[in-house]
């Protein structure tokens, strides 16, 4: 039986698992690992959360991308939390194979509808109703 793989695009580094969203991501990664699924974890760096070697125990690979902050990323039709997590390096890594992709939270969804990922199994998992909050913030 061939190995099973999955890409998980996380909005933050899920170590230590010490607040809501990253708790969910971390235990999902650990559970998938225990089920024999090879996890390719893609994390956006965020102030106060450093790359974590602890994640290597549960992942085939852990890749880190800088979050791009500043006014330029706020001038987008996409929410700031999404546009500031745009990374062509992430896209290059996702295009190396055809494994399914799990986008964790609205933050990580910049490439969800990218035509380069057409035909790929993609799952968007929201942990809150952030889309409502940001839509109403946009209307104001």
Task: Name each model feature, range by range.
Residues 1-61:
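N-terminal subdomain of nucleotide-sugar transferases
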Residues 14-15, 107-110, 130:
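Glycine-rich nucleotide phosphate-binding loop and flanking beta-alpha elements
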Residues 33, 115-119:
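Short, conserved loop/helix-junction motifs that constitute active-site signature segments
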Residues 41-92:
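A conserved catalytic-core segment of Leloir-type glycosyltransferases
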Residues 47-53, 110-112, 132:
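Short, charged/polar "capping" segments at the starts of alpha-helices
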Residues 69-78, 122-140:
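Acceptor-binding helix/loop patch of EC 2.4 sugar-transfer enzymes
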Residues 92-110, 121-123:
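Short N-terminal targeting/anchoring amphipathic segment
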């Amino acid at each position: 039986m061939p190995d099973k793989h999955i890409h998980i695009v996380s909005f933050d580094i899920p170590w230590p698992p010490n607040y809501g969203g990253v708790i969910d991501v971390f235990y999902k990664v650990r559970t998938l690992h225990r089920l024999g699924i090879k996890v390719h974890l893609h994390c956006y760096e965020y102030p106060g959360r450093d790359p974590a070697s602890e994640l290597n125990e549960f992942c085939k690979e852990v890749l880190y991308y800088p979050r791009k902050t500043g006014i330029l990323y706020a001038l987008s039709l996409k929410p700031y939390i999404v546009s500031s997590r745009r990374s062509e390096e992430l896209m290059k890594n996702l295009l190396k194979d055809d494994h399914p992709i799990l986008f964790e939270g609205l933050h990580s969804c910049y490439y969800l509808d990218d035509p380069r990922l057409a035909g790929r199994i993609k799952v968007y998992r929201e942990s809150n109703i952030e889309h409502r909050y940001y839509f109403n913030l946009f209307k104001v």
